[in-house]
C-alpha cells in the first residue's frame, strides 16, 4: 500500500548505518526531530514492547508495530 511504502521510506531514512534495523539512537533522532515532546525514555519503552526478538534493535516488522504505538501517544 502507499502508506506502507511511505513507512518503508521512513524506516530506510532512519536506518543511518543501513543495518536493516533501527537502534534506539536512530529511532529517537528521527522521532524527536518531528515530535520534540517524545523523550528517549519513551522510545526505549516502545522498543521494549515491540522488540519481539529482544535484540535491542527494531526490525522492519517491529517498526510497523512501533509506528502504530507512536500514533497512539498523545503528541
UniProtKB/Swiss-Prot annotation:
GO molecular function: calcium ion binding
Entry-linked PROSITE patterns: EF_HAND_1 (PS00018), EF_HAND_2 (PS50222)
Pfam families, per the entry: EF-hand_7 (PF13499)
UniProt binding sites for Ca(2+) 2: 51, 53, 55, 57, 62
Xref: InterPro entries: EF-hand-dom_pair (IPR011992), EF_Hand_1_Ca_BS (IPR018247), EF_hand_dom (IPR002048)
Keyword Calcium: yes
Domain of life: Eukaryota
Biological role stated in the UniProt entry: Binds both calcium and copper, but not zinc. May be involved in calcium signal transduction.
Name of this protein: Calhepatin
Organism: Lepidosiren paradoxus
Lineage: Eukaryota, Metazoa, Chordata, Craniata, Vertebrata
